[in-house]
Structures are given as structure tokens and as C-alpha cells.
Amino acid sequence: MARREKNPIRATVSMKIGLSDSLLAFVNNYVRALRFSIFWMKENVKNPNEKGTLSKVHEGLYGKLKEDYNLPPKVSADCYRDALAIYKSWYNNPKRGRFPRVYKPTVWLTPKRSYTVDLDRMVVKITSVGELPILGYPRNLKEYANWDMKEARLTIRDGKAFLKVVFEKPKVKIQPKGSVAVDINMSEIVVGKDDSHYVRIPTRLHESHHFKTLAENLQKKYPRRWKENKRILHRIRSFHHKAKLIMEDFARKVGKWVVEIAWDLGANVIKLENLKNLIRNVNKLSAEFRDKLYLMQYHRIQYWIEWQARKHGMNVEYVNPSYSSVSCPKCGRKMVEIAHRYFHCPSCGYENDRDVIAIMNLNGRGSLTLSTAPQMRDVIPNR
């Protein structure tokens, strides 16, 4: 039996597929079977964590789901495994709220046995339904042509059918040949390896903060009416949603740009700041700076950088950011600010912008240089 790959790289791709009467009937039968399976487990499975639970569930449900709900053999197995996952999630929850009920029309499908995707013909074949055309898909779908297909979710929403497929590939071990560092600030993100090879990426924080301010101004203008008036409430929600989408879009694009810059500079290791407990002392900050700190989503940006790096075969390393913006990268002495965000070293005379100083110091830390510096716990964010 093949050994499961440890920490593989996964991506979920959503595709819009054609809707048919047979597909709607298939989904309806699955949802009814899923409801029955969950309540059957409530009565017959007292502890889902016990050994042999899956065999017991198979004996009690497999035949019934095939006969009473007209599900194909493999889909019947998918159905009771889906129900067991829902029941186990509820059972292991310490608070254990209301017993789970199924309302959304979703189907759990297993690759090759329950469904197959042909990217050349752009069709999806689902057991007992047949072939359905792929009507919509992301532009980078072809990038996953050589990845392995895993479990998928078939969902029906607003009269449209979507298939969300998980693609997976093993993580490749690489030999480090060079590194770049990333310094994330509110005004710009700096990516580079030294003071002559770096790129500045302006952020969109001011746009996001603008829409958040518009929403708050409406709440101040209508302190009582905004909760009851649907038009005002919709407007406020749309402003907050725009602010969130702007930063999410920026974070996704930054991940791609950082990887491209690293390739151009001949590096395959990306060093990021260890920002653990970044907002521990957030209450001591001003209200405006606190809002911008939340909107900036430092960890979200780092998440997409790491995801794109792993996808393209690069390593990501988190290093200690302590004093990286104020320590001289040449001699290590503390530097003095002589202008706005511009520092001078009184010892060796080196001068530069604090962001460039930061990437030089960050790039000199980590495993490539066998650093033994302890990880930082409290980080003061850059303005």
C-alpha cells in the first residue's frame, strides 16, 4: 500500500457545470440519504470515536442507502462517510449545540469512482448522472492538469451547479541556492536580497481604509436609523465588504508577485518575519492606526506568499524580526534616524531607508546563515 505523502500541496478549484434533471434528482436523493444516516448514527452509534465504528456504519447503512435512496455503490459509501464526519464533528464539540441538520444540497464525491474530470474535453462525468459540460472555470485551471484529483464537493446554489475539486501534489525537497526577504509595512511591501536588488510594492491600504471610513461615517450620521433602515444597512455592509475584498485581492496578487521577484533574483527561499503576537498590545495604539493594522491583514499576506511559494517549489522560512529596521546591516550597531524613515549608522557611516535595511537584516538571518537567534514573541508593527 502506497504511503500517504506528508504535508502535500493542495488547491481547491471551483468549476461551474451544466445542470440537468438527472443531476437534481441525484443531489436530492443524496441529501435525503445523508439526513437519514445522521439520525441513524444518533440512535445506533453512541461513540463515533470507538474502533470499528466505520465497519458498523457500513453494515447498517450501505445496503439501505443503495436500495431505498437509489444511490450508486460508491456514492452510498461516500454518503455514510460524509454523515459520520458530520456526526463526529458534533460529538467531539465540547459545547455541542443543536443536533446537526442538513439543508444545503451538497454531495461528497470520490475521484475515479464517483466522478472524473476531463480537462481536454472540458467535461465532468458523475456516476449515475453522466457527462456534464464545464461552463465556467478559473483562468489558471490548466496549471493543475498534472496534479492528482482528490475528493470533490458538488453544490447547487441559485439554480446553478458547482463542482469544487481538491487538487494535490507532493511537496518537493529543494536545495537552497539563494534567498530574498519580505518586509511588510502599511504603505509598501519591500522584497529583495540587498540594497541594490529590491522591489517596492505599494499597498492598497488607503483604498480599503477609505471604504471603512465611509461605512463608519454613515453609522455616525444615522446613529439609530442605520440598524433598522435596510437601504442604509445595505450601504454600510457594501462598504465594509469592499474594504475586505480590496485587501484580499491585494494579498493574493502579492503572493504571485513575490514569487516572480524571487525567481528574477535567482532565489528559491523566501524569508518572512515571524509576527507571532503582533496585536497583543493593540489597545495601546491610536484608533486610526488600530483600524489600519486590522485591515492590513499581515498574516493573510504571509499566508498567500507561502502558498504561492510552495506551489512553485520554493521554501519559506520565518525569521526573527527583532531590531531588523534599526540595526546596521554592515556592522550590527544601532542606527540613528536622520530623516523620516531614513537611518544613519554613527559607527560605519552606512545610510539607507529603514525598509531596505530591514530586508538586508532579515535576509542575513535564518538557516542559510545558521542563525541561533531566539524567536521573537512581541513585535511592534511598522507604520
From Swiss-Prot:
It comes from Acidianus two-tailed virus (ATV). Transmembrane segments: none annotated. GO terms for molecular function: DNA binding; metal ion binding. Pfam families: Cas12f1-like_TNB (PF07282). It comes from the Viruses. NCBIfam families: guided_TnpB, IS200/IS605 family accessory protein TnpB-like domain. In the N-terminal section; belongs to the transposase 2 family. The keyword Transmembrane helix does not apply. This is TnpB-like protein ORF383a. Zn(2+) binds at residues 328, 331, 345, 348. GO terms for biological process: DNA recombination; transposition. Keywords: DNA recombination, DNA-binding, Metal-binding, Transposition, Zinc.
